């Protein structure tokens, strides 16, 4: 049991739960007593994550889901509620990163793909989660934006558009649903030491030493640090926290 949080008897859904921040958050929810629905488009990673948590004695449901397909999202959320009887918390984490590209040369297909996953995917997840939470009259949703939702960096216009958009979705839904007992917030991770970031480093799209030097804390963040922020936003301790975009970035945006 995670001594920091107690979600016994509650149900959480985590998208992109096969690795990185999603897996760390699913693990943290499970260790805090919640039943957890895991979704991911990567079935091998999803099955490995499910096995890890099941072998540890946690209550888990694994669902293959492409968040860019609203029908799949609706089915996953509905299946979660049918299985566990309710939905109390959701972390809409699934997303992709893209290599740098000159804004004048970027193909429309690339813009559409990153926004289909990072923005429309979050919209679809939040939409269908809210349907069930609205019926309950309670719930907490955390959408994964990014440091890139708070600032702009050259070469990543499509990515920044998607992550700025997530904050817009979050604030609008937060204001709409706070009077109904549902809190919606966003977490904005900085550069986090995950498989996705490791892949970017391996491809030469990111220099680890530069990334560490750009953080006032002089290191990359960990997936577990993002998980703790997400769990706090879902906890009673954050009961008066509504519509925030919480940077977890080692001080980057405070510079």
Predicted regions and their residues:
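Short C-terminal tail/terminal secondary-structure segment
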Residues: 2-4, 97-100, 151, 231, ...
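Conserved mid-core segment of classical short-chain dehydrogenase/reductases
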Residues: 97-112, 135, 155-158, 198-202
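Catalytic Tyr-X3-Lys loop
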Residues: 104-123, 138, 142, 159, ...
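Active-site helix of classical SDR
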Residues: 126, 162, 170
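Residue(s) in the substrate-gating loop at a strand-loop-helix junction
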Residues: 146
């Amino acid at each position: 049991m995670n001594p920091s949080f107690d979600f016994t008897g509650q149900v959480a859904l985590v998208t992109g739960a096969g690795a990185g921040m999603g897996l760390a958050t699913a693990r943290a929810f499970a260790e805090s007593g919640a039943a957890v629905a895991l979704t991911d488009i990567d079935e091998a990673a999803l099955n490995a994550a499910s096995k890890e948590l099941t072998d540890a004695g946690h209550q888990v449901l694994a669902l293959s889901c492409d968040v860019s397909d609203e029908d799949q999202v609706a089915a996953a959320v509905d299946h979660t509620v049918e299985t566990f009887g309710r939905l109390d918390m959701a972390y809409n984490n699934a997303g992709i990163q893209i290599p740098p590209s000159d804004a004048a040369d970027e193909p429309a297909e690339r813009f559409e793909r990153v926004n289909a996953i990072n923005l429309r995917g979050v919209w679809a997840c939040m939409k269908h989660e809210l349907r069930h939470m609205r019926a309950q009259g309670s719930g907490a949703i955390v959408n994964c934006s990014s440091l890139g939702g708070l600032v702009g960096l050259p070469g990543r216009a499509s990515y920044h558009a998607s992550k700025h958009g997530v904050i817009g979705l979050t604030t609008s839904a937060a204001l709409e649903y706070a009077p109904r007992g549902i809190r919606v917030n966003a977490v904005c991770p900085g550069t986090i030491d995950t498989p996705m970031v490791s892949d970017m480093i391996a491809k030469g799209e990111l220099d680890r030493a530069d990334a560490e030097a750009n953080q006032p804390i002089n290191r990359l963040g960990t997936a577990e640090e993002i998980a703790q922020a997400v769990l706090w936003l879902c906890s009673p301790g954050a009961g008066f926290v509504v519509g925030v975009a919480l940077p977890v970035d080692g001080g980057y945006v405070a510079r």
